[in-house]
């Protein structure tokens, strides 16, 4: 968590939208959405609990049951949404390096991304609009500052950027520990590590 985004300092920031790239406590996300009163989108990180709901379709009123995850926030993992005039897609999780939720092999991440890619292509055919923002937890493969196996990132995220050229690809997962990390480019896409926090104008 970034101390600038807590308490009275939070009142100086007037965003149109808050995006979390994962690994932030759910109660903190709930705090942000209640204080800022703007939409908050998130993807789960490898240190987050599983947000995949169990199959409850057999239950009466299943649609009215609360979903896992922070209240008032929208999980965009493997989803395409339109918020604040932006078309935003999400791909959560990190490369599997131990047993735990929200960790995937490169092959698993590729399968998850294919479903997202199909939605993106269908939307683009229907209305001609392109993707504006890709939100991931892990960085696109080869674009992280860290080179250890847990942090090299997903090939699937890089492929989504190459195919859809969003204005922005925001990721987390790689902690800079006090350093200012450079903004990178993948074609026309700005690739930004948002840890610990960033205010970004589009």
Which positions does each model-derived feature cover?
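Active-site neighborhood of phospho(di)ester-bond hydrolases with catalytic His/Asp-centered motifs
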Residues: 17-23, 40-46, 76, 133-137, ...
